[in-house]
Amino acid sequence: MVTTVISNVKRQSRASLVGKRNAGHRSAMSKLADRLAPCGPVLDPKAAERAYEAIAKRAGEAMGQVDAAWGSLAPVFAASPYLAGLARRDGKRLPRILGGDPGETLAAILAAAEAVAAEPDFETARRVLRELKADLHLLTAISDLGGVWDLDQVTGALTRFADAVLHAALAQAVRQEVSRGALTHVGDGSAGPAPGLFCVAMGKHGAFELNYSSDIDFSIFYAPEKLPVAEGHEPQAVAVRIANHLGRILQERTGDGYVFRIDLRLRPDPSSTPPAMPVDAAMDYYESVGQNWERAAHIKARIAAGDAAEGAAFLEGLQPFIWRRNLDFAAIADIHSIKRQIHTYKVDDRLTAKGADLKLGRGGIREIEFFVQTQQLILGGRQPDLRSPRTLDALQALAAAGHVTPEDAAWLTQAYKDLRALEHRAQMIADDQTHKLPESDVERKKVAALWGEGNLRVFDAAVGKMLKGVNLRYGRLFAGEEALSSRFGSLVFTGVEDDPETLATLKRMGFSSPERVAATIRGWHHGHIAATRTERGRELFTRLAPRLLDAANATGAPDQAFNRFSDFFSRLSSGVQIQSLFLAQPRLFELIVEVMAFAPRLAATMAKRPTALDALLDPTFFGPIETPAIAPWDPEDFEGAMDAARRLFRDQSFRIGVRVMSGTADARDIGRAFAELADLIIGGLAPAALAEVERIGGAFPGQVAVVALGKAGSREMTAKSDLDLMTLYVADDPRSMSALKDWSAEVFYARLTQRLTSALSAPTGEGTLYEVDLKLRPSGTKGPVAVSFAAFEHYYEREAETWELLALTRARVVWASSPDFKARAEGAIAAALRRPRAWKKTAADVIEMRQLMERERPGKGDWDLKLDPGGLVDIEFAAQFLQLAHAAADGPLRQNTGEALAALREAGLADAGALSRLEAAWRLEQDLSQLIKVALEDGADVEVEPKAFKALLAKAGGVTQFKSLKPKLAKAKAEARAAYEAVVKG
């Protein structure tokens, strides 16, 4: 019997199927079984036979209804395990549906669902609704696949059922709250089960366009003063529990299945609001931070359950938000962005059925909906005829008004119907909430069969052509405007759920957690941060978001760049000015994102103090680097001076660091700028420290100076340099004591040194400044922290070792209590350096010292620019040795290494070629060192850094590619090492 029936099933074309549907419209009420046509071929006869036998076991005498229609049912059950399961589970279900008029059967299902509202038992209500859902699903699928119902009838049946069960579920939820004493009674009539509370259907639910396995989108709102809350209970808590009850009733899976998945995320700001919201709070949200995609979503909004009058008043109040009569250019551009976030591909790009996302993919349903809704938002404020909630009705209205050509309207209408039909069939196979055609040919054949096509190649070609046609027409909308996608694909952040194509784009861009990035950006679009709280701020961010993601990708470290930008962006007090700057100066914005990726200290500065970016607004920012002439604080306020110094340091270091990252300043200028900043801070804090010591211990009759050594002294500082300092003092009278505490000169100036060291190094609420090292003073840690002038002269005349004299070549007086004492200190330093000394002994000491360093602190590899052979230490030793060797004969003395090498070459005091090679290596290593110190943590491996950083490093090194930099650096270091040995060993 089964084999005979299946063999008699003949494949029908799509045209004959449509004809059968049209015939169905004309028929009087009759049995569904008599009106069915086969939807396509029987792909799996064995599956159909198994379904037949299982149904027959349960149907009994009613199997005659099934036999009569089996020719039309076999293709369905052969392709859809889900539908076969519905028919098997209840033996009477399929015969009952086949034996009745589909319209009458639907009416009976809806009436039964409505009646559940009065069911006294909660669990019984849940079970009945699930059984009715099974009836509805089988009825709808057979009526659709059999050509009896068209798309409107299918989606209408699904939506009307959703409304009925939502009403019943709401009544059951209210009963639960009444039983616990939180509500006084269950309402009835137009006020609904809970007077003051209503459910707003959104999306396809709102437009009577539900798909087969759709969830239902609705929002729950309530007027607290009208909700019949019992004494001692809060309206908010009750409303939230009602929302939770709805979830249990509708979407919780039981042995009988589920009714509908529910989605409450279309309410205002769902990540930070309860599932049920007061009406006033919702209205405030839409009036202040409502987005254009939310306006589009509310085009389809209607009251599906609850207090009809309250709901109608709410929707009426939203009309000015949805339909704006006056839109400025920026607002129109922001509406366009809903469409422009989707990547527009060339029309000759292949679009295939295999794995196609019929809803969100290129050429899919969303593109048709956006095509319609964006134009509705722009035009509907002045043209009420365009406000239809239904996609196809609105498309026809746009065509009638001349905004869409009749040809495009007709083409998109048919494509929309076909896409929805395909979507339904993909879902009917297993009741999956999927919108994709299967990747597998075997599985895709099932969809094709349910669509009336037995040839997969023909099916795929037809689907591909349709997708391509939709995408082509969609791409022409607002053509020529700025794209808000990426070359990697779509970047859609509208709505409340992740867009699959956007997640794929973010993954291609290198983000390790696309979902987190998408959620963060959606939060910014929702106005969660001050920068996007205003409408203008959100409009600007819509344009900035794709540029941010592209710039983060370009760094090669997208996660770091995005995370640090997020820290910064979230702390802005407003966003219009800075976003406008970023959009107006894209290269500057890309630079800032590079800083975020590669310079954690600078990124932290921007995050903690976003006003640091104000410097970028200064037109002189990329001009000569200038340091303020005078410290901007009162030296009499020690604590205030410490905080002010840290603010100045942070701002100035940021300016200098950005110049390093941008490659717009010479490394020598950078080193000098960092040193001049240190000079300014020392020169401002030393008087403050002196005033503080005098406040505590009283004034002392004497003079004091601060001497910088090391890189601070030579003006070769980097972003991470510490301060090598020494304090020199002299008492007017060795027997003098401080005015209040009777401190001796040694105690007074030791206290001053300690106070200054603390001012320069201790953390405060404004951060830190420098690490301070006093070990280069005479006798190092064994000697007093402050050095008397006499002890200094004696030590460097009688006791200083060669390495200490080498260090002294970089000594520079950066502050003194009087000009006279500054000159006196400078004279003592010069005198110590210009004393006669034996060349050979000095050279031997230098060689021994360098060898000791190589044993105890060897270089760590090619990128150790300091200690590796031929690195900065070799070059500095060579320059310092030559200065020390020739100082007694009035040779040049320069603190800066580069200047010293140049002066020595000009004086002819060593082989010019060797000195030139040392100077060239020093310049290269300085260029690289400045960038590395700004960007990387200590010990970082340059080789594993992103390509974008390597490109910056190559640029700093004067080559076009990183692969050319390593041999250039190796050659420079080899030449520097040879020159060092030639100079020192003679």
Curated annotation (Swiss-Prot):
CDD domains: NT_GlnE_GlnD_like. Coiled coil: none annotated. GO terms for cellular component: cytosol. Residues 486-986 are annotated as: Adenylyl transferase. GO terms for biological process: regulation of glutamine family amino acid metabolic process. GO terms for molecular function: [glutamate-ammonia-ligase] adenylyltransferase activity; [glutamine synthetase]-adenylyl-L-tyrosine phosphorylase activity; ATP binding; magnesium ion binding. Gene3D superfamilies: 1.20.120.1510, Beta Polymerase, domain 2, Nucleotidyltransferases domain 2. Pfam families: GlnD_UR_UTase, GlnE. This is Bifunctional glutamine synthetase adenylyltransferase/adenylyl-removing enzyme. It comes from Caulobacter vibrioides (strain ATCC 19089 / CIP 103742 / CB 15). The gene is glnE.
